[in-house]
Amino acid sequence: MSSQAFRTGFVAIVGRPNVGKSTLTNALIGSKISIVSRKAQTTRHRIHGVLTREHEQFVFVDTPGFQTRHGGAMNRMMNRVVTQALADVDVVVHVVEAGKWSEGDAKLLPLLPKAERTILAISKIDALKSRDELFPFVAKIMAQHAYGAVVPVSATKNHQLDQLLEEIAQRLPEGEPMFEEDTLTDRSMRFIAAELVREKIFRLVGDELPYGCTVVIEQWEETDAHARIAACVVVERDSHRPILLGAGGQHMKRIATEARQDIAKLLDKPVHLEVYIKVRKGWSDREGALRDLGYE
C-alpha cells in the first residue's frame, strides 16, 4: 500500500472569453462536461468536473469568460461567477491564448491569488507559427504578474496536459476525496442535456443569433430502456424564431438530431428529444428572469 498522502481540492479554470477554457477542462477530465463553440460567452455557469487518480482528486471549476463590457445583467452575473470561483478554490489556472494578450486578459490579473496558487496555462500553442514566439510572449505576461508555474498546452493535441496536472497536484491540499471515484461532474444530467442543446445552437446559428438564447429542460422521463426529453429554447425576440427554425425547419431538426445523439451517448440508451421555442422578451438583461431560468 502506498504511503503517499492523498490530495484533493478545487481548481478554477479562468480567462477572458474564447481562450479555450472549456476545451481544456474537457480534455483534462477526459469527458465532455462543458460545451464548446468558437463563440465567446458559451459557458455561462460554473461547472464542476471531477478527475480522480491514484493519489489525487481534482475538482475543476470551468467558469464563464471574464467580461470587460459592463452594463448587462448577464455580464454582471457571469463576472460574479468568476470572482466567486477565484475566492473559493485551492488552485487557479489562468488560461491565455498563445500570442493573443489583450485588455480582457489584463483585467483578470488583479483578481488572481498569490503566485504559489496560480498557474499560467498558455493555450492553443499548436496554432503558433513558431515556438520562438512563445518565450517573449510569456516574459511579457510574467512582467505584469507572478505565477507559480507556466505550462504551454494544446488541449486538442493533448500536449503537456499531464505536466499541467502535475503542477496542479503539487498545489492541492491533503485531504479525503470529495466525490466517488467514477464521478465526472456534480451537475445533473438535465443540466448537461440543456447545455448540449445550447452548444448545437451556438455552432449552427451562432453568427446570426445574438446571445439572448438559453435552454430549459421542461420534461424528463427516463426508464432503464430509454429517455423522453422536452427542451425549450428561450429567445428574446420574435425575429429570433425564424433564425432558429431555418428554411423548412431544417436548423431546428439538425439541432435536435445532433443534441439527441450526444445525450443518447451520455445516457447510454435511446433518447426521444423534442425541442421547441418560446419568446421571453428581455430575459437576459433582468436578474430576476436569469434566476428563474437557472442562472446563478
Swiss-Prot record:
- The protein's name is GTPase Era
- Pfam families this protein is in? KH_2, MMR_HSR1
Please list where the region (G3) is annotated.
Answer: 62-65
Give the UniProt keywords, A-Z.
Answer: Cell inner membrane, Cell membrane, Cytoplasm, GTP-binding, Membrane, Nucleotide-binding, Ribosome biogenesis, RNA-binding, rRNA-binding
Coiled-coil regions listed in the entry: none
Entry's Gene Ontology BP terms: ribosomal small subunit assembly
Tell me what gene encodes this: era
Q: Which residues bind GTP?
A: 15-22, 62-66, 123-126
Q: Where is this region: G1?
A: 15-22
The function of this protein is: An essential GTPase that binds both GDP and GTP, with rapid nucleotide exchange. Plays a role in 16S rRNA processing and 30S ribosomal subunit biogenesis and possibly also in cell cycle regulation and energy metabolism.
Per the record, its GO cellular-component terms are: cytosol; plasma membrane
Q: Where in the cell is it found?
A: Cytoplasm; Cell inner membrane
The record's annotation in InterPro entries points to: G_ERA_dom, GTP-bd, GTPase_Era-like, KH_dom-like_a/b, KH_dom_type_2, KH_sf_prok-type, P-loop_NTPase, Small_GTP-bd
Outline the extent of the Era-type G domain. 7-174
